[in-house]
């Protein structure tokens, strides 16, 4: 019996070898994966292993900064074109709506301005950009609010009244300046007017009617001066191709309604040089420099984010930030151009 047992034990297959012991790191990883996934299968690394992001070195950072700077310069040029061609029109439309609402309230209340000073406060000058009249020219489909002052900043919001001239509808000569192309280009079709076309202006004093007598450019003879007590309006804008002015275009129109008295005009010494026809605004350089410095800082920051964080995360932050700065610079840059463009 004992011999039979020994024979069976010898003929039985040997037991399988014990599994190889796992390294401590592998055991810990398996334990963590099992605890996190509830015993699910562990995630295996890709065949080539995980790709590590290269370290941020001064060379890569400098190259990224240069690339971001060139991109920002290109976007700035594109943004300026988009601002002049599209966004400035939206700016003009919004400003006109606000100006019309404000003037309508003043007309209804009888507090619309009729001179260079604030109504009921002769010691205070009317602020630049205040709405003073509504100008209509049916022949070219124009209806716009006229503002006080003729700086480039004022003319972004609509045509401006030259403060050294009388208000429209008053006895004397009233001068209105307006842009040809940018910011709505309200005076872009003045060259289409012909003698006999009508012009109407609504102010706090009157509803004045005018009739065009002539269009003139540099070198053309001046029209005869209006008689004493008569009214005239002169519309002024850039002449020539859009954004390539060759001079100044003036439209003279005599008043056919009864002029109202004028309380006076602002002295020439109070007028800023930036309010003259085709003037530029050098004060726009300061915000341009400040916005430009901020763009340089953003270029450096974006290059670091690109290399240290990731391109898609960087784009999410870069697009709104650069867009805002580019449009802000474009708005200020247009003030360096002649105010009638």
Label each region the model flagged.
Residues 62-72, 291, 312-322:
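Alpha-helical transmembrane segments of integral membrane proteins
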Residues 1-61, 265-281, 289-298, 302:
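Terminal targeting segments of Actinobacterial cell-envelope proteins
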Residues 294, 298-341:
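Alpha-helical transmembrane segments forming the membrane-embedded cores
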Residues 3-6, 49-52, 56-288, 333-341:
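Solvent-exposed, non-transmembrane regions of membrane-associated and secreted proteins
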